[in-house]
Regions:
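C-terminal helical "tail/cap" subdomain of flavin- and related membrane-associated enzymes
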Residues: 3-5, 317-398
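Conserved N-terminal helical subregion
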Residues: 2-6, 55-171, 177-189, 241, ...
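Conserved Rossmann-like nucleotide-cofactor binding loop
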Residues: 16, 39, 164
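Conserved FAD-binding catalytic core of PHBH/FMO-like flavoproteins
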Residues: 128-132, 141-270
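Conserved N-terminal glycine-rich FAD pyrophosphate-binding loop of Rossmann-like flavoproteins
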Residues: 38-58
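Glycine-rich FAD pyrophosphate-binding loop
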Residues: 25-45
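Flavin (FAD/FMN) cofactor-binding core of flavoprotein oxidoreductases
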Residues: 74-78, 262-277
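Conserved mid-domain beta->alpha element of the FAD-binding
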Residues: 13-21, 268-353
């Protein structure tokens, strides 16, 4: 692109920003994506595409490619508390699609970036950042200067820049305290045991332990664990994995014994930032946000990646209307928030209720909702928020 007038400037190229750029490019809009990191970077993100996220991927024309690239189709989940089966559910009872897909977030992002390469109206600028902005008399961002000296004049700016969002903090002056959970979460990759290939299994116990076993690709398995902070530190300090295996054996049943045996050390585990957040305002003037810039959900829901790409789909539709002058930008962004806030609110609040009830079997069983866990977006399922304290994060705008 040689003209500095563009339709949308997206700051951040995680899965949400990449998906938004691709969807807008397919609609013919002129988009520039700015990302501080390199194109090929390791993202320690989610691995689950649930039915709500699969619908976005399918509408974008990417579903067949996802399965060709090793996305693993799954149908069932078992949930245990203190070693006893608490819930079994098949996704066919939650959604007509009847399945979910296991695929690393970075693999999906890489696929989307390859598709963007074929979109003439989308430009990707890696290892680049916003340096300054200029506003017009209506306080809308009129001009953006990048650190490479380029000056862009976008109609809309989007913050898809994660938990520490520059757009949220510096452009919208929203300073929100993200509330971390007291028990850290870690993920490791190991050899695939037959029991993990058979079925996804989630285990929790009355001492605040959590272990989730699932396959990734066709020869590896993921193990996600969470324990109270000091216990987690001690377990990870034994790099041979003996302490962790003994701890897992206290609440993981014999059906996953082979999976425990495959945990040959702790050096492969990496931390996952976890906290809870849902802003009460997703936009202001000609600036909008999506994904982790506006909400954080506990990974026990398995929906972080899904919420980000659902946001991207809804925002792409809203911006398409405004950019075609089918409605005012303010109305389009208000519609985006009206569509996404109730969904994000329900899932963030549901995840918080689950994460804070692990120790209490009866309470955990009462909170666990197969419809929400399976990513149902029906009003009846989302209305379940009434059964637990909603998470809200006021975002006063100047």
């Amino acid at each position: 692109m040689t003209d500095n007038h563009i339709d949308v400037l997206i700051n951040g190229c995680g899965i949400g920003g990449a998906m938004l750029a691709y969807l807008l490019g397919r609609q013919g809009h002129r988009v520039v994506v700015v990302e501080q990191a390199r194109r090929e970077r390791a993202i320690n993100g989610a691995d689950l595409l649930k039915p709500a996220g699969i619908r976005v991927v399918e509408a974008a024309g990417l579903l067949a490619e996802v399965t060709r690239r090793g996305g693993r189709v799954r149908h069932e989940l078992e949930v245990y508390h203190d070693g006893e089966l608490l819930r079994y559910f098949n996704y066919s009872n939650v959604d007509a699609r009847g399945y979910f897909i296991l695929m690393p977030c970075e693999s999906l992002r890489r696929l989307v970036l390859e598709k963007i390469d074929g979109e003439a109206t989308v430009e990707m600028l890696f290892e680049t950042r916003i340096e300054a902005v200029q506003r017009d008399e209506r306080h809308a961002i009129d001009q953006v200067r990048l650190n490479d000296g380029r000056v862009l004049r976008p109609r809309v700016v989007v913050g898809a820049d994660g938990i520490a969002s520059y757009v949220r903090r510096r452009l919208l002056d929203i300073d929100v305290e993200r509330r971390p959970y007291p028990s850290p979460m870690l993920v490791g990759t190991f050899a695939l045991a037959p029991c993990v290939a058979e079925r996804n299994r989630l285990y929790v116990d009355s001492q605040g332990g959590l272990a989730y076993f699932y396959p990734i690709g066709f020869d590896r398995a993921r193990l996600v664990v969470s324990f109270p902070r000091e216990e987690a530190r001690e377990l990870m300090a034994d790099t041979r994995g003996e302490s962790l295996r003994r701890r897992l054996q206290r609440f993981v049943g014999d059906e996953s014994a082979e999976a425990i045996a495959a945990v040959t050390g702790t050096s492969r585990f990496k931390g996952i930032p976890i906290g809870y957040l849902n802003l009460d305002r997703y936009w202001a003037d000609n600036v909008a946000m999506l994904g982790d810039a506006i909400h954080n959900v506990h990974p026990i829901t398995g929906q972080g990646m899904n919420l980000a790409i659902e946001d991207a789909s809804a925002l792409a539709d809203a911006l398409d209307l405004a950019l075609r002058d089918a409605c005012a930008l303010e109305d389009a962004l208000a519609g985006y928030q009206a569509e996404r806030f109730p969904v994000n609110q329900a899932i963030v609040s549901y995840g918080h209720a689950l994460a804070t009830s692990l120790e209490d079997r009866q309470r955990f069983a009462g909170v666990f909702d197969t419809a929400l866990q399976g990513s149902s977006r029906t009003p009846e399922a989302l209305g379940g928020e009434r059964s637990y304290q909603p998470v809200r994060s006021p975002a006063p705008l100047g």
